[in-house]
Amino acid sequence: MFKIMKDFTEQEKIIVLDFGSQYNQLITRRIREFGVYSELHPHTITVEEMKALNPTGIIFSGGPNSVYDEDAFRADERIFDMGIPILGICYGMQLMTTHFGGKVERAKDREYGKADIHVENPSRLFAGLPTDQVVWMSHGDLVVEEPAGFEVTATSKSCPIAGIADEDRLLYGVQFHPEVRHSAYGNELLKNFALNICGCKGDWTMENFSEVEIAKIQEIVGDKKVLLALSGGVDSSVVGVLIHKAIGDQLTCIFVDHGLLRKGEADQVMATLQGEFNMNIIKVDAKKRFMDKLAGVSDPEQKRKIIGNEFIYVFDDEANKLDGVEFLAQGTLYTDIIESGTATAQTIKSHHNVGGLPEDMQFKLIEPLNTLFKDEVRALGTELGMPDAIVWRQPFPGPGLGIRVLGEITEEKLEIVRDSDYILREEIKNAGLEREIWQYFTALPNIRSVGVMGDGRTYDHTVVVRAVTSIDGMTADWARIPWDVLEKISVRIVNEVDHVNRVVYDITSKPPATVEWE
């Protein structure tokens, strides 16, 4: 491993152990909000591996199991003897309880939802917090007898032991979920743990992150060349600017314009990244190549496959024209690492077939963002001096407008989606809602309807407006856009976009629907 990686072991951090809770990522994100670096690791981590990480504190997450199940998730019990602060949340508290000789039993009724707790014995965990507060419960078991050396710190009507603490050994447990927004003072409780109990300074910022990453990239790459597939999206753009700041023209970006981008997107990407940041970008006009392959294709999965494969072929063709490239950069995020089942992020590894690239493309992979969440990537982009138009660009699927035109793709349909989407984004911005709505776009379903425009009957396309609010995209709710804003959007689309006589608003949440239509 490269010498520069010592920065990670010296950095104060809180490790979250994954016991299967749906809120695991939230715990990590909350800790990071206090300026403390945090990572999610599997519960199977050994004490030796944990010591190598050199954590300042550890959090045991919740989980769906009972501690008495035969296949219940366990932790290396030696972790309790490391002498550093540990916080057990829900299942984590029950695991801590049984380890130290307390008693856990099945609750008469599973408790799920808001509950009122009373803080009886204020430990350092509850310092400065109200005696009575609302929390979020989600458990089927409960602690009925605290272990020796522990005190009960909080109670509720249905849960007599809602919190425990052993101040001497810096061991704490809560039966509720402080990481969930429904817990009124959950953030303050986690902040007490991170800053007051663990003693973290809270100095992890995007400024020092970028400084460390630039130094890592310089040491790892040396005088070699790096190749980046630039999509124009937030992740690849931030990766490009970060690496360019580190190694300058040793970075070459390939930007494939497949003709499925949003209005003005290709020009904006080139003007910003090449014009303002002086990045070395090879723009490939592959619009005809993609449209020829997509002619007559209406099945969404087939469209995805064609677009994905053709992108690979175009990228491969251009990469083969370059000499001396040793590294491939990729905009992998921490979410991707977690969802792939490997919560151990490495800065560099051998590249064989990442993202479906040809197996004979033997690059080393460099992923500078693989410890960051999406909101942190945006913050990093701002820190790097990137304009809001790029940093706050709307999430955009890999196949682009190819899956926002339902059915067969034609140039006419693409223009309808481009123009209507541009109007939507303009009106959302005018209404000051662009930071409030997580994602918004237009789609063109493969239907036409009768209308009346002027004095004549029309039979034209229907445009769907889709806008959702979300935290991480795993679930989403339809955005409550004010009626007057929706009216402006509808009127403008019908009047300014050719071949459209109807606009509808999708008010379906995820689940049951997905955010995209295809």
From Swiss-Prot:
EC number: 6.3.5.2
EC top class, as a word: ligase
InterPro entries, per the entry: Class_I_gatase-like, GATASE, GMP_synth_C, GMP_synth_GATase, GMP_synthase, GMPS_ATP_PPase_dom, NAD/GMP_synthase, Rossmann-like_a/b/a_fold
Binding site for ATP: 231-237
Pfam families reported in the protein's UniProt record: GATase, GMP_synt_C, NAD_synthase
PROSITE patterns named in the record: GATASE_TYPE_1, GMPS_ATP_PPASE
Function field: Catalyzes the synthesis of GMP from XMP.
Name of this chain's protein: GMP synthase [glutamine-hydrolyzing]
